[in-house]
Amino acid sequence: MTKNATSASVITRLSPAKINLFLHITGKRADGYHNLQTVFRLLDWGDYLHFSVADELIITIDSVADNSAVDNSSLCGQLLTLSGADTITSSIEDNLIFKAANALLASAINSNSLPKNLPKVSVRLDKHLPMGAGLGGGSSNAATTLLVLNKIWQINFDQDTLIKIGASIGADVPIFIFGQDAIAMGIGEELTAIDLPEQQYLVLTPKAHVNTAELFAHSKLQRDIAPLSIKTIQNHSNDYVQHLNTPYQNVFTPVVTNLAPAVDEALRYLQELETQALSTARMTGSGSAVFLPLDAGVISDKARLAKWIEEAPCPAYLVRNL
């Protein structure tokens, strides 16, 4: 399937995965959230979302000046149907795709930007990314929904506005709206583009899920790494792109590998391949997925790659950057 496709009434979009090349916590905020520093890398691998646009229009308002009278939740229920997500959440309202559509409508109402007529849209999710893996699947679904419905419904918010809406849904949503590799700060919404070399990765997805709230509350989690300047991160990419050198790390790794034996096993498997791959294995996000950057020499050795995938202790995928 192509990454993105459009027919007369169906729009198909890749909802890509992400990995964190490193992940630091630099302190706790007054609002209870934590400040982070990371480099996000988007992957040419993920879920697919199919948006089918109906001919039927819903009259949303009597006039463009009457936005305040609209109930966005009720309107979203009329406008949006969702399939393929039945096993993810107990109800459509809890799904991040629906939440994204609802947040988009709410922002349009609040800014008096809601068009008078909107078409109904059916969204079908083809889920490929495992949940709770640190790959950003749900957040990517939300971001893709915001981007596509913003155009279908002709709300026409700019990227900065969509990023603000995305941040209200989840900390990882903004990077997928930004749409390119980036240095991230704050809770993940302060994004600076970064140019990184083309890269392929071996990604392992062990069946393990550790509650994120439990991780952030864990006594062994390091929460006070000294912040790095954007310039430092830009100028020292050799310390985290292929290898992971001090001070770069993923602070969640020791906590997660202690709590989840399957993650520890998967990471140890990749660590045994580091000498051949000429790189450093690591975990993405707060887990459970782990990955190994691959040297060009490894990529050309198809038999060796096939062996690594076959012998992996859990599902393994060969992917590249977006």
Swiss-Prot record:
* Entry keywords, A to Z: ATP-binding, Isoprene biosynthesis, Kinase, Nucleotide-binding, Transferase
Q: Which reaction does it catalyse?
A: 4-CDP-2-C-methyl-D-erythritol + ATP = 4-CDP-2-C-methyl-D-erythritol 2-phosphate + ADP + H(+)
Q: Name one GO molecular function term.
A: ATP binding
Q: Which domain of life is it from?
A: Bacteria
Q: Which residues form the active site?
A: K18, D172
According to its UniProt record, in which pathway does this protein act? Isoprenoid biosynthesis; isopentenyl diphosphate biosynthesis via DXP pathway; isopentenyl diphosphate from 1-deoxy-D-xylulose 5-phosphate: step 3/6
- What enzyme category does the UniProt record give? transferase
Q: What EC number(s) does this enzyme carry?
A: 2.7.1.148
Asked if the keyword Transferase belongs to this entry, the reply reads yes
Q: Which Gene3D superfamilies does the UniProt entry name for this protein? A: 3.30.230.10, GHMP kinase, C-terminal domain
Name the positions where ATP binds.
P130, M131, G132, A133, G134, L135, G136, G137, G138, S139, S140
Q: Which GO terms describe its biological process?
A: isopentenyl diphosphate biosynthetic process, methylerythritol 4-phosphate pathway; terpenoid biosynthetic process
- Which NCBIfam families does this one have? ispE
Its biological purpose:
Catalyzes the phosphorylation of the position 2 hydroxy group of 4-diphosphocytidyl-2C-methyl-D-erythritol.
In the record, the note on similarity to other proteins reads: Belongs to the GHMP kinase family. IspE subfamily.
What is the name attached to this protein's record? 4-diphosphocytidyl-2-C-methyl-D-erythritol kinase
Q: Which gene encodes it?
A: ispE
